[in-house]
Curated annotation (Swiss-Prot):
Protein name, UniProt field: Phosphomannomutase
Record keywords, A-Z: Isomerase, Lipopolysaccharide biosynthesis, Magnesium, Metal-binding, Phosphoprotein
Entry's Gene Ontology BP terms: GDP-mannose biosynthetic process; O antigen biosynthetic process
Protein source organism: Escherichia coli
Family, as annotated: Belongs to the phosphohexose mutase family.
Length: 453
């Protein structure tokens, strides 16, 4: 059994869970199951990504698949390459923000559609585990070619903004020594070539699989100091930080204050609806009051289950122009409904210039109107029992109602879920209120006490 196969992707500890042999088997299984003619491959900066990618390529070639290798890349560059070239699929070797001794893969088929549990991943897993493939036919073996799509990708990114709208901006960008660095360099060069008055202050921009400044995961408060400090030191207008494969971007205002992804969803939704009144916007259920309030004014909010596969599927079904999750995943119809970490900050930078306001000013009223706890993770030995304690407490208060308490619309437990981390279960808590910070903080504190009782 291959334990590296998860619900939506492949992730495992290097060695027993994921190695070159397993990578070859995954490539062979992908080829045998989908029978693609050509697919694109890429890999992040991790020290094992290149060898795993080449083993994956060999498996694909042995299955008769032509492989186009775009080199070191972010996950969204694989999405872009897949739909831009019109090939049959793509695979990115990445462990994103997982620990150093992990790696993984994200798989898509034609049109950059995700391959997850119920859309082919279990089939690939079954074939890889069986490891019973027909002999390699050397006359039909696939070809391998290295290609460079960076310029075409940057062209696409710049299609989302009008550079003429940009006024003088100073932006701190922290690539976290991940795969974003070369893309940031290419964007900087494009700004200069177009005469845009944008200065980029680059932090930890050099790709380094040793991650000398720690695994880049700005969702964690302890990973935000370098970006915050650089914004303050340089008097920047905004800070941007990426995770390892830059499919998420995290924003900081002009004071170095981290802006929860939840409010960026509302900000981007509002920007899209100004240009596309009546459009549909997809959001996840964890925190939603602000997003629904913004979208209802000019469009149609549509709630989706949390998770990239669900969001993308719902966006296609609804023909939604944009979708956002509070976890800093942002999805765009014109990006094949995929998530990208580069497009959001470009749009927000343009918005700051168009509105003549700072990022802090753009989100301040929304943060005051709908204060939220942000997602709080608690690693607990007995998570199910802990969640039951919370449910029982509030069902008593509500006379037997569910733990999505306080239907009086002042405050709600937006989400309380149990998820698996790499080592132990984690309970994720989100609380939001309508304009009442003390109430939100009081309920958050109470729930955390109940969880840890």
């Amino acid at each position: 059994m291959l334990t590296c196969f998860k619900a939506y992707d492949i992730r495992g500890k290097l060695g027993e869970e994921l190695n070159e042999d397993i990578a070859w088997r995954i490539g062979r299984a992908y080829g045998e199951f989908l029978k693609p003619k050509t697919i694109v491959l890429g890999g992040d900066v991790r020290l094992t990504s290149e060898t795993l990618k080449l083993a994956l390529a060999k498996g694909l070639q042995d299955a008769g698949v032509d492989v186009l290798d775009i080199g070191m890349s972010g996950t969204e560059e694989i999405y872009f390459a897949t739909f831009h070239l019109g090939v049959d699929g793509g695979i990115e070797v990445t462990a994103s923000h997982n620990p150093m001794d992990y790696n993984g893969m994200k798989l898509v088929r034609e049109g950059a559609r995700p391959i997850s549990g119920d859309t082919g991943l279990r089939d690939v897993q079954r074939l890889a585990e069986a490891n019973d493939f027909p002999p390699v036919d050397e006359t039909k073996r696939g070809r391998y070619q290295q290609i460079n799509l960076r310029d075409a990708y940057v062209d696409h990114l710049f299609g989302y903004i009008n550079v003429k709208n940009l006024t003088p901006l100073k932006l701190v960008i922290n690539s976290g020594n991940g795969a974003a660095g070369p893309v940031v360099d290419a964007i900087e060069a494009r700004f200069k070539a177009l005469g845009a008055p944008v200065e980029l202050i680059k932090v930890h921009n050099t790709p380094d699989g040793n991650f000398p400044n720690g695994i880049p995961n700005p969702l964690l408060p302890e990973c935000r100091d370098d970006t915050r400090n650089a914004v303050i030191k340089h008097g920047a207008d905004m800070g941007i930080a990426f995770d390892g494969d830059f499919d998420r971007c995290f924003l900081f205002d002009e004071k170095g204050q981290f802006i929860e992804g939840y409010y960026i969803v509302g900000l981007l939704a509002e920007a899209f609806l100004e240009k596309n009144p009546g459009a549909k916007i997809i959001h996840d259920p964890r925190l939603s009051w602000n997003t629904v309030d913004v979208v209802t004014a000019a469009g149609t909010p549509v709630m989706s289950k949390t998770g990239h596969a669900f969001i993308k599927e719902r966006m296609r079904k609804e023909d939604a122009i944009y979708g956002g999750e509070m976890s800093a995943h942002h999805y765009f119809r014109d990006f094949a409904y995929c998530d990208t970490g580069m497009i959001p900050w470009l749009l927000v930078a343009e918005l700051v210039c168009l509105k003549g306001k700072t990022l802090g000013e753009l989100v301040r009223d929304r943060m005051a109107a709908f204060p939220a706890s942000g997602e709080i993770n608690s690693k607990l030995a007995h998570p199910v029992e802990a969640i039951n304690r919370v449910e029982q407490h509030f069902s008593r208060d509500a006379g037997g109602g569910s733990h999505r308490w306080h239907q009086h619309d002042l405050c709600r437990l937006a989400a309380l879920t149990c998820a698996s981390s790499n080592t132990e279960p984690v309970v994720r808590l989100n609380v939001e209120s309508r304009g009442d910070v003390p109430l939100m903080e009081e309920k958050t504190k109470l729930i955390l006490e109940l969880l840890n009782k």
